[in-house]
Each structure stands twice: as structure tokens, then as C-alpha cells.
From Swiss-Prot:
It comes from Listeria monocytogenes serotype 4b (strain F2365). Keywords: Cytoplasm. This is Regulatory protein RecX. The gene is recX. The keyword Nuclease does not apply. PANTHER family: REGULATORY PROTEIN RECX FAMILY PROTEIN.
Amino acid sequence: MKITSISVQQKNKERYNIFIDEKYNFSVDEEVLARYQLMKGKVLTEAEIEEIKQADMVRKGLNKAINFLSHRVRSEKEIRDYLRKQEMEAFAIDEILKKLADMDYINDLEFAELYTKTQIKTTLKGPRTIERELVEKGLTREIITQVIEEYSDEAQLENATKQAIKIMKRNNKSAKKMLQQKIITDLIQKGYTSELAKVAATEATSELDVADEAEILQKQIEKTMRKNKRYKPSIAKQKTITSLMQKGFSYDTIQSYLTENEISFEEEE
């Protein structure tokens, strides 16, 4: 089989169409063209053509991978998954990854270190969340253990407290006890240990005093009473107390407030 002509692709000047016996057969990257010294008149066997096509697949995949890496650093697994989505064959993926490693485009330890530092500085995620994300990105347990040590106890507490303050601002209608529990639960879900979550919750709510809680209770009582005034006095009172207890106020605190402020449900009927 003889190459009868070679033409540059119109949309990509770095790729060439190869015609065998006057018919289009395949296309190759400029680097592959030069490597295999493809030119008009050269005779190729079927095995040689298949080898050239495979080499071109690797070259094409390598270019795609480098472009993929140009946006940000990636783990080996992320690149492998990307190449699979590009419908690259297994042999090509393995060779591409080897070439990238030789070119220092892939280094999972450096990737994990950079990713962890970025998450610590730019997000309020806990260490367990970062660990889970690193697992999803294909990092080994050894690497994860090594890089997660960079998340110091001080940095964890600082980030957890910042997150706790955000949670507190979103839930400023609850009693302090309920608010602290909400903060602890949310922080655990965000990847912090229960011990650190408790410390952060205490730290974030440390400035809330009795006066603050009394003001919150007053607003909640007024709001709940308006909502329940369509009921009979006894039912309205029970519903109001139940609702307030669900927000973290104790029964005794509610009763004391109602008594001290001479709040009568009869008057709201």
C-alpha cells in the first residue's frame, strides 16, 4: 500500500490527511508525520499503518491531556478519567500517563499538597471533607495522611469558628443550647471532629448572654402567639410552648417568661 498524497487539514494546520492508493486512509499529527517519515510514494504494510494510527492516538490524547492540565493541576486519576471520556483506548491512556509523568506534568504528591493548602486557605472545609475529596481524586492513603497533617489544629479551629459564626447568623432565632447543637451538627457534616465542633460552637456563641436569649425568646413568643391565636386559649398556649421548646428553650424558661411578663393567652383569644 503506497501513500499517493498528503494534504494539510483546513481546520487544523498541524494535522495531515494521508491518502493510500488514491483514497483517504487516516490522519496524523505533524509530529507523527515526521517521526515515521511519511511522504508521497512511501509503501506501508497494514501492520505499519496500524502502528502509526496508534502512535497518533497517543499523540492526540497527549495534546488533549496537556490542554486539560493547562486550566489547573490534576491528579493522575482525574487525567485518566478525562481520557476515558475522550474515548481513548486503554493502551493509549497508559502511554499518555507515562509520558506526562516523564514530562513532570503528573505528581500526585505535589497535587495533593497544593489542593490541601488551597482548600485550607480558600474554604472552610474540615479535614475529613478534604480527605474524602482526595480519595475521590484517586490519591493514595499514604499521600493523604501526609498532606492532611498540614491542616494544623489552630487552622482547623479558626476555620471551624468562622463557619460556626456563619451558621449562628443563619439561625439567630433559636435558643443558645439549640444553636450550639445546630452548629456542632453542621460542622461535623462539613468534616470536623465532634470534639473540635464543640469547641468552635462554644467559641462562636460565647458572646451570647442571658439578655440576648431573652430578646430572642420574646420575639419568638410574640410571633408564635400571633400564629396560634386562632386556637382556643389552652390549645394556643400548648402549641406556643411546644414550638418554643423545639427551638431549644426549656419549659421552665418559657413558663418563667410568661409569668414574669404577665402574658395571658386569654387576652389573645
